[in-house]
Amino acid sequence: MSGTKWTEEQLSAITTRDCNLLVAAAAGSGKTAVLVERIIKIITNEENPIDIDKLLVVTFTSAAAAEMRERIANAISKKLDETPTSKNLQKQLTLLNRSNIMTIHSFCLGVIKNNFHKIDLDPSFRICDQTEGILLKMEIIDELFDDKYDEENQEFIKFIEAFSSYKSDNALKELVLSLYNFIMAGPWPKKWLKAASEDFDIKTLQELDESKWVSVLKESIKIELDGYIKMMQKAVELINETDGLEPYFEGFSSELDLIVNAYNNVESSLNDLYNSLNLITFNRLKTIKKNTVSDENIQNLVKQIRDQVKKKISALIEGTFIATPDKMLDNIIKSYPYINQLTELTSEFIDRFNAKKKEKNILDFNDLEHLCLKILIEDNEENQIVPSTIAQKFKDYFEEVLVDEYQDSNNVQEAIIELVSRKNSDNPNVFMVGDVKQSIYKFRQAKPELFIDKYNSYSLDKGINRKIQLYKNFRSREEVINGVNYIFKSVMSKTVGELEYTDVEALNLGASYPKKKNVDDIIGGPIEVHILDRSDNKEENDESKLQAEEEEIGDVNLEARIIVKRINDLISKKDGSKFKVLDKDTGEYRDLKYKDIVILLRATKNWSEVLLDELGLAGIPVYADTGSGYFESIEIRTIMSLLKVIDNPMQDVPMLSLLISPIIGLSAEELTDIRLIDKEKYFYENIIKISTEKLISEELQEKCEYILSSIDKWRRKSIYMPIDEFIWYLYMDTAYYGYVGAMPNGVLRQANLKILFQRARQFSETSFKGLFNFINFINKLTKSSGDMGSAKILGENEDVVRIMSIHKSKGLEFPVVFLAGCGKNFNLMDLNNKILYHEELGLGPEYINLENRTSITTLPKEAIKKRMKLETLSEEMRVLYVAFTRAKEKLIITGAVRNAEKSIEKWINSAVLDKDVILPYEISKGKSYLDWIGMALCKHKDGKILRKKLGFSSEMCKDDLSMWKISIWNKYELDMYDELDENQEELDVKISILDKDVNKKVKSEVYRRLGYEYEFKESTKLTSNISVSDLKRRNMNDNIDTLEIFDLEEEDNKNKDVITPKFLQEKKGISSAERGTAIHFAMKKIDFSKVGTLKEIKEQLNKLYEEEFILQEEYSSINPYKILSFFKSNLGKKMLDVYNKGGKIYREIPFHTEISSLELDESLPQKYANEKIRLQGIIDCFFKCDDEIILLDYKTDYVENEEEFKEKYKSQLLYYSEAVFKMTGKKVNKRYLYSFYLEKEILI
């Protein structure tokens, strides 16, 4: 790293010592490189080198820790190459294996393992996985509520009546579990519960006035009133500047004074504030004669401003002061018993859960942090953070504690860091690096306030608490940088965003992009904003066009089509010019590839599926890493329905799903016949009746008998088989695993079924057993823990457009970023829950009056609601910042609005209130990313299209370097990839003519067709598709005289790409075929630039496992040495040589071709010579070397005789050679088998 040219600020972050140091590192500023270089400098200091194991480096994820170790190892190795005799470097490389570079959970686990005796813990404890943890919580919460019902405690019963639905108490159970998860992110969960309950033990208005809730309410009211004052002041200013508006002046000024008076009373008592707000009145405006005003747009604007202020002040009074202060106090007092019950229930749940875990000798991830705290704190009873002897040893041992991604820390982690470091001493040693603008994990209880407090209090100058700012961005083009700065200077503030985005925080250009060499090439360019207008406004002459396009295309589809159009434009311009991006390896511009493009979404649910469809229809290769959709996939729903029927067949919904599925395959008519037997009975009862009584056709009776016998067989097996074995048995017995493999996306569907099997295996290893418990667990997982996401079957180097959530994109970068769905409203649904909770403000319930069954919000709930809303919007602001800063060269924003004209009017009304920024109050009222972006762009010179729509001039524009291109699309004018077939009209005419005399001919035609006998009956025995592998197997069998008829279910089960997981016990391992498929998959995905050493290959295999491309058994079955041997062989070296020279290596190439049916069965008559069979297969590898095409097929078989081995696969390689010729037009010159068993290449 010595060759790196560091900036002054980076160098300061690397070399500054003897203080607590906070490094505020903006997106793309080289944060990780700086952290690694700091560590290298510390451990290689010539005067005072510090051993690497005396540093504690805390990372956010295990993957980040592994990457950090790898970077440090590479840096040390590089230095060793320069000075190979350095004993210190050799020592550090050795110590790296035991260094403390880890997540906070890993550190806590180590502390617990070494000090288990201090907390009365059995040293043989294990960490329970998520599955077992969820099941235990479900069991304990049910037991807790059952016991409470048995106690017949009236306070508990009232609590249940008040906050449960009329159907069940599930919502309350979820509330207790949710509150438990929330408070466990704090260091003292029980103390928090106790304090939250005591907050409601107030008796007087004075106590209420002094509460933190009122303080928050006043803060919120102040922000709102300040916004209204600014709005009215702007209106008065416009009145003064516009001829003819003088009659408005007195009324506006009077109303402004009343609002100012209320603002001045905000800090007074609750009663005084209530009264001053109710004094604000709006009288009727004086009339102004027509045609006397110089600018009617201004007149309309000031009236709109006044109307808005009037409505908002009314809403403020009704929303905040839902009653008089006396009545609000009364509601708090009456809510106290409910809050007391909730906190007691949650506290008891903690005790029971801990007791159950102790009984089973297990810990969960929350325990790791809290037990670690218990070990590190001397006296835990008073909840005082007094370091224990063990904590003091850590303080003495660690020379420096370095925390990566500090903006995502929580209070527990902060306490642990303080206890093991010298942070609060005269000799501080904590290094913290992160970017608070990228703190987007509030839902995991991250506390960006920890970073912000230090950022605001630490000094830029010398001292024991210092900060350094890294705001030079080495990622993005100037167009992107300027756009990011313009938007966030306009909209980010301490109110919304929790940080003022000033010139200090702004990104500075650090990346160097060369000028283009070809004048026709397109590089960079303005940030694009595409606004889809969803309104029904249309020109009169559009009526016919509207009727022609009367298809119900959703708004998401239309937005997707805008994206499709822009992708196609970027990939291939109609005028021949091409969009270019900089190749980071060559430093030259190259054509944009699909893999350079990402589509980012705030949430992928309901969006990714549509985008996949629309891009797929347009021929654009695309992949969505959704993190959802797993439980909604047809294959998982079908298997879950099957399991539910086996558990309890008296369930019509899963039974119907099973009956229409391919497993049973009843038709709609058959289902109707079953239903009509007795509409009052369950389907299962009617099936029993049909099978025992001859009520319907013999065929349906036989089917019903089959259904009953199958269910009975499955139910008997479910009793004694472990759930994972049972599920795999069902896959095989029903042939469903093979069936889904033959469906579109079959590889993905089978991989999804494998995941369910693996989940069942995890479940079977817990203390919970049985089909019922597994179904209950999956149901709970679906509802409370979110979707698992479909299986991953795509590597990072595939040339496809990627769709992902903004959260998943954090830390990544892409040449072209589409930020889609920006018109979607923020999700504020949680604010409507009956009881809210907040770390600082405690609990906020609704007050439920059981006598008249009414509910009303309380002052604590309103205070928490207002704070949570601002915090949620601040989080959304930071999420938007993360999305913007993923783009390297091009940023394209899309979003839909209900009515463009009304939206733009709203944006302009917000934008005109201040000449520099959008007022925080206006930002807080924004409902989407597009609202924020639109407000800012209304003030930009490139926002002319927005201002023009409402007739506004450019006087409100700001000077700015950023460049924007704004387009507004009307939903009825969007003409992309949906043109009607040119021949459709002609076809309709022909059909209508045919319809006129169809009745005359239909009878005789029906009889003719029913009596028809097919001339080529023998060909019906032929399969329409066959794989090369099957063809090879048939050719090997000399005794087959006629074509063997293969079972379709057996054929469906064959899939070369998917490893079939066996339910056999672990000691039996995976089969040879599975091992072979695993090696093939590894050879498909492996990066040829990192295969020089055994370590590099191991790291790549480990990455495939960590990213869930291969399972544990598959990972363990692959011998990395065998792969290294291939790359050390002559053939492997030749392949790498081609790759290193920029040649193309074609891997895992599927093909389809046709062969004569006589090649399959020579006994067929000659008339079948023209009957074609579709031959399909997958070519492992081929490449061009020295003007020769070389074909390679990997084999993992046991080889006894090499000649027989060659003969066995000779025909297969001939078919592959023919396929390569058809694809490339070039003959294969050399065909090789590579035997991993022999570690040898064999020329065929």
From Swiss-Prot:
Keywords: ATP-binding, DNA damage, DNA repair, DNA-binding, Exonuclease, Helicase, Hydrolase, Isomerase, Nuclease, Nucleotide-binding. Its cofactor is Mg(2+). It comes from the Bacteria. It catalyses: Couples ATP hydrolysis with the unwinding of duplex DNA by translocating in the 3'-5' direction; ATP + H2O = ADP + phosphate + H(+). GO terms for biological process: double-strand break repair via homologous recombination. SUPFAM superfamilies: P-loop containing nucleoside triphosphate hydrolases, Restriction endonuclease-like. Residues 4-477 form the UvrD-like helicase ATP-binding domain. InterPro entries: AddA, DNA_helicase_UvrD-like_C, DNA_helicase_UvrD/REP, P-loop_NTPase, PDDEXK-like_dom_sf, PDDEXK_AddAB-type, Restrct_endonuc-II-like, UvrD-like_ATP-bd. One of its GO terms (cellular component) is DNA helicase complex. Residues 517-811 form the UvrD-like helicase C-terminal domain. Its EC number is 3.1.-.-, 5.6.2.4. GO terms for molecular function: 3'-5' DNA helicase activity; 3'-5' exonuclease activity; ATP binding; ATP hydrolysis activity; double-stranded DNA binding. ATP binds at residues 25-32. Belongs to the helicase family. AddA subfamily. Heterodimer of AddA and AddB/RexB. The heterodimer acts as both an ATP-dependent DNA helicase and an ATP-dependent, dual-direction single-stranded exonuclease. Recognizes the chi site generating a DNA molecule suitable for the initiation of homologous recombination. The AddA nuclease domain is required for chi fragment generation; this subunit has the helicase and 3' -> 5' nuclease activities. This is ATP-dependent helicase/nuclease subunit A. It comes from Clostridium botulinum (strain Alaska E43 / Type E3). The lineage of its organism: Bacteria, Bacillati, Bacillota, Clostridia, Eubacteriales.
